[in-house]
Amino acid sequence: ILTELEKYFTVNFIDYKDIDKLSPDDFSIIFIATGGVERLVIQHFESLPRPAILLADGMQNSLAAALEISSWLRGRGMKSEILHGELPETIKRIFVLHSNFVAQRSLFGMRIGVMGTPSSWLVASNVDYLLAKRRWGIEYTDVSLDRIYEYYGQITDDEVGEALSLIHI
């Protein structure tokens, strides 16, 4: 499976002892080559990439090990996904996961202005600012509608036109 993946991706093997050398900007997949590695993965839980993407080729009991590891990780609130099955589907899924990873990393350090608050009957529409910062590195800032109206009243049509000319869609 790894030989086939190298036709589509740059594959760098990192020994589990060097997992702490990976940066948050490195897209990482954990290759479960054999059964019996469950304890090893659990021992390095804090260093694992999040979410944990587990690749199993079905050889040497690797799928059973990946299932066991995934179940253990999910039991501790960590998202995980197992890549296993037909190679073309696995390759497509890796492309999607990588694209999602790049998009998420591009949000890191961004600030998002929040205008207004959800209506009281919307019980699941509140944003957990602290969780968003921890998970994605995004900072939410409350912006009062009075401040928006103030800026709206000060802006000229020429300034709007100039700002719109800078937007490339």
Residue ranges and their predicted role:
Residues 1-11, 67:
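Short, charged N-terminal beta->alpha structural module
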Residues 8-16, 80-84, 138-144:
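Short beta-strand elements in bilobed, periplasmic/extracellular small-molecule ligand-binding domains
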Residues 14-108, 118-128:
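Cofactor- and metal-binding active-site motifs of prokaryotic enzymes
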Residues 119-135, 141-157, 161:
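Domain-scale recognition of functional cores that engage charged ligands
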Residues 167-169:
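Conserved small/polar residues in nucleotide/adenosyl-binding loops
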